Swiss-Prot record:
Keywords linked to the UniProt accession: ATP synthesis, Cell inner membrane, Cell membrane, CF(1), Hydrogen ion transport, Ion transport, Membrane, Transport
Protein name, per record: ATP synthase epsilon chain
A single BP term in Gene Ontology: proton motive force-driven ATP synthesis
UniProt topology in membrane: Peripheral membrane protein
Gene name, Swiss-Prot/TrEMBL: atpC
Amino acid sequence: MATFHFDLVSPEKLAFSGEVDQVDIPGVEGDFGVLAGHAPVVAAIRPGILTVTTAGRHEKIIVLGGLAEVSEKGLTVLADVATSLDELDRAQFAETIAEMEEGLKEHEGGELDLAIERLDHYKSIQQQLSSTAMH
């Protein structure tokens, strides 16, 4: 299988850089996969789990929004936050969700809609983390 270069960058670090077979991205308009030779595109990403496939090995990384750009040079994802499952403190993640639920009382109108949408994304990630597919 042909490979391509992939960089995953967050404000804190270069989370991943290297040659990969495939990257599956949680897009705002729907999840999508990138292979070598993919058409150029820029897409917004939603909070979710990004999967990097290299030589049959899958690495899952939580991203909390950002942008993905596919070009002739490869794929670059600029993520608001990027955390590998090995680095994730699951108890802290669950606490963040609880705090978000409590904080819903402070929002109304459009702000409430956005807060609920973000909470739903976090809960979806938590559910994926609990599934057997993540092991």
